[in-house]
């Protein structure tokens, strides 16, 4: 996989805009980037997170009461910490600030609960071409995907629900990477499409149905999409 950015992004959905913004900016201390309109009463509030982006997607209308995704937490590396600091956002999503380098976390680590660790190992190493750094730990750039818990994870027909719902990997060629992942055994979560002249994106799904956005941003790759 040819990366356009060496950091994974993480997306969540919430109906609690003001409370979430206060938490991520004041409690966690993430710098605010900007707000983008996604349509359908959805606004994306982007925050810098060690080169990654925390995407707090605020929904104007009530979100469907879906089962939680398999994304159960995020660890954020921070200089100057003596130990880990567990936190929870206003919807109960787990966040832990960790000393930089703790268990190999240099940027962020996205924590998963999985039904089948072997299926996830095949997916992350073969379909997604991430590097296995140790058992249940996979590196993409300076970000980690970590198998932290074992099942159960319930698939949902709809993916826009409360809590952590997807990760994003920024690539040079969305179509080529999407087709390559499917050819290597990944499953589609949404065919490539354009968002104006700024982004081409698609979705694939991990073995438990968690969505991964394959994003090609003109601001990172240059030129036309």
Each model region followed by its residue ranges:
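Glyoxalase I/VOC metalloenzyme domain signal
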Residues: 1-34, 46-134, 138-190, 194, ...
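Conserved beta-strand edge residues that scaffold enzyme active sites
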Residues: 38-39, 195-196
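Short coil/loop residues immediately preceding or within conserved phosphate-binding loops
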Residues: 42, 199
């Amino acid at each position: 996989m040819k990366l356009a950015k060496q950091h994974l992004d993480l997306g969540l959905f919430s109906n609690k805009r003001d409370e979430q913004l206060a938490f991520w900016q004041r409690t966690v201390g993430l710098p605010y980037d900007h707000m983008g309109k996604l349509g359908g009463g959805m606004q994306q509030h982007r925050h810098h997170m060690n080169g990654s982006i925390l995407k707090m997607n605020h929904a104007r209308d009530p979100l469907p009461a879906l089962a939680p995704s398999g994304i159960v937490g995020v660890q954020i590396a921070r200089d100057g910490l003596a130990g880990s600091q567990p936190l929870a956002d206003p919807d109960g999503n787990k966040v832990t600030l960790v000393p930089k380098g703790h268990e190999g976390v240099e940027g962020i680590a996205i924590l998963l609960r999985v039904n089948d660790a072997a299926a996830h190992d095949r997916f992350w190493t073969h379909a997604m071409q991430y590097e296995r750094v140790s058992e249940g730990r996979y590196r993409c750039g300076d970000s980690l995907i970590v198998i932290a818990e074992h099942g159960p994870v319930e698939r949902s027909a709809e993916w826009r629900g409360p809590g952590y719902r997807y990760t994003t990997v920024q690539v040079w060629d969305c179509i080529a990477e999407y087709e390559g992942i499917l050819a290597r055994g990944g499953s589609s979560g949404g065919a490539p499409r354009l968002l104006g002249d700024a982004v081409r994106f698609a979705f694939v799904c991990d073995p438990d149905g968690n969505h991964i956005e394959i994003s090609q941003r003109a601001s990172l790759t240059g030129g036309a999409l």
